[in-house]
Regions:
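Short, charged/polar, Gly/Pro-enriched secondary-structure boundary elements
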Residues: 49-53, 118-121
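Helix N-cap motif at beta-to-alpha junctions
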Residues: 14-15, 80-83
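Short amphipathic alpha-helices within nucleic acid-binding modules
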Residues: 21, 83-88
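Short, charged/polar surface micro-motifs in flexible loops or helix N-caps
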Residues: 48-51, 62-64, 82-84
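N-terminal beta-strand motif that seeds the catalytic metal site of vicinal oxygen chelate
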Residues: 1-17, 72-75, 124-127
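Core segments of cupin and vicinal oxygen chelate
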Residues: 2, 9-52
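Vicinal oxygen chelate
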Residues: 31-34, 42-43, 77, 86-127
Length: 127
């Protein structure tokens, strides 16, 4: 039986570009470690999340992009100010898939963006 959720891994095409995107969302780099001569793993976390969950960004030497498939959808992160988060991302050329919206009248405000490798990230501001 599983006892703890540890991390989500994304395979990325360029380390610094992906790290910068997640830093813009508030993630911090926890550790960067080479895996022999095959890959580099960068573990990132949000302040206050403790040891887990972590986002693992894996760069495999010699691979520029990956087929994302259709089964996976997104990760979700809470933001304190959705408008200012989107403004900061827009400066870097990252725009929402569609304008922010609420799923119910008093519900959270949400929108989706894509990271530099095309992975969807849901941004959620409490209602």
């Amino acid at each position: 039986m599983a006892t703890k959720y540890l991390h989500t891994c994304y395979r990325i095409g360029e380390i610094e570009r992906s790290v910068a995107f997640y830093e813009e969302l508030g993630f911090e780099e926890v550790v960067r470690m080479p895996i022999r001569d095959e890959a580099i793993n960068v573990f990132m976390n949000l302040p206050g999340d403790g040891d887990v969950p972590r986002l693992e960004l894996t760069y495999n030497h010699g691979v520029d992009s990956y087929e994302l498939g259709t089964g996976y959808n997104h990760i979700a992160v809470a933001v304190d100010d959705l408008e200012s988060t989107l403004t900061g991302l827009a400066v870097k050329g990252i725009n929402p898939e569609k304008p922010p919206y609420r799923v119910s009248e008093n519900g959270p405000q949400i929108c989706f963006v894509r990271d530099p490798d095309g992975y969807r990230v849901e941004l959620i501001q409490a209602g």
